[in-house]
Regions:
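A transmembrane-helix-recognition feature enriched in membrane-embedded lipid enzymes
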Residues: 1-56, 106-111
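Soluble catalytic domains of membrane acyltransferases
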Residues: 49-161
């Protein structure tokens, strides 16, 4: 890939992120849960396309009705969240440090990310209760039990908290 194409993709990605921040800040407070999910799904599809990722899903997977679920994922890239959201939007569990990241932390917080303070036993109970409530409310919740990214085909030890 040429340097020009790389810089154009990066510029499109930055603009896409800024547009997403604007939509979350200005539109999300007035949208229903279904409306927010549709926008997250569309935004994620566009982001994945900007990055040049091609996806292919099994037709039976696409045809499944959206239902409450707890999804356990192997984390291989920062794109994982967006790839998952292209099929069915989810709330994700993430380390609390992410909340402090400029722009990304705000975006995660306002799109329903559930933050956990690693190593704090009391926080595990709070997260558990939040997960149960989300699933009872009909949402899908996803998390990466390895707690970090790993090369494709590699499974790291799971973190209990």
């Amino acid at each position: 890939m040429s340097a020009v194409v790389t810089y154009l993709r990066l510029a499109r990605l930055i603009v896409h992120l800024l547009v997403g921040l604007g939509k979350v800040g200005l539109l999300f407070p007035f949208l229903s849960a279904v409306g927010r999910e549709a926008r997250v799904q569309r935004w994620s599809r566009q982001l994945v396309a900007i990055c040049g990722v091609r996806m292919r899903f099994d037709q039976t997977l696409q045809a499944q009705p959206v239902s409450p679920a707890l999804i356990i994922c192997n984390h291989i890239s920062w794109l994982d969240i967006f790839v998952i959201n292209t099929l069915h939007t989810c709330r994700f569990v993430a380390k609390s440090d992410i909340r402090g990241w400029p722009l990304i932390g705000w975006l995660c917080e306002h799109t329903g990310t559930i933050f956990i303070a690693r190593g704090r036993a009391r926080d595990v109970r709070r997260i558990y209760e939040g997960l149960v409530k989300s699933i009872h409310d009909g949402e899908r919740v996803a998390f990466f039990p390895e707690g970090t990214t790993a090369p494709q085909g590699t499974v790291l030890p799971f973190h209990a908290n």
